[in-house]
């Protein structure tokens, strides 16, 4: 997870109202598991913690053999990332993709419930040229190995969407995303999107209310283009991604929120109270979908642990639901 330069369009038309959303429980929610720390529990202890808390989805950011082994027969659904540094190699040839699949997927699947492979996370700049060929090569390699049930996608930053307010105006700002969206449509895979209301609120606190950013009542925003009403910034952001998919000619592609969370320390509005309010609200909310898509929205909270060796803003080290000793950073119910 990197700093999100969320488009400020949301600030243009937010106003205070009095309509509250009714939370709905979600059947399946995951948590992202990062390992950039020198004091974290063993992989097997982490899987046990997931199971004890009833967390039935996980995302890992590289083909971590220890984590994959620990996940065997756990039933936990997995997003398995290919590191951005490996994308160019996999994009270069189907044989490279086949080798990656043989080394990192075949030894574990189906004992490990690998649902999606993410061809990169928040890929930027010239490296985006590798996303589409890497996805194609991975699809071919999985199919050849008899593993076609595993879907290949990529995980995008929210700022891949331009004109994000109102949500119905959302459009992908980079042309390559149209090809990615259409490939996803052809394979039945979802688009993975990292969605962080925290950064939008942090950057526009005078225009976006804290309640609107944290699933609390008191704010209503109406999309004048389609009449849909929004009571949470999260919904507005997700529906902007759906609008962009429609404009790319891929209206049937589902969105999976591959990261979302709120820091408990280290920056503006980063507190245990706000983090708990947001993440509990997220868990309670996503089972009912968004105003545009009233169906359960598969969502992965960032992150399982506070990771003390992450670089960047201080908040980067404070997104964890749990401390390294496995105690909760704050109370939350799954």
From Swiss-Prot:
Gene3D superfamilies recorded: Glycosidases
Source organism, top-level taxon: Eukaryota
Entry's pH dependence statement: Optimum pH is 4.5 (at 37 degrees Celsius).
A Gene Ontology molecular function term of the record: glucan endo-1,3-beta-D-glucosidase activity
InterPro entries tied to this protein: Glyco_hydro_17, Glyco_hydro_17_plant, Glycoside_hydrolase_SF
GO BP term, pick one: defense response to fungus
Entry annotated with the keyword ATP-binding: no
UniProt entry keywords in alphabetical sequence: Glycosidase, Hydrolase, Plant defense, Signal
Active site: 122 (proton donor), 259 (nucleophile)
Similarity comment text for this entry: Belongs to the glycosyl hydrolase 17 family.
The name this protein goes by in its record: Glucan endo-1,3-beta-glucosidase GII
Source organism: Hordeum vulgare (Barley)
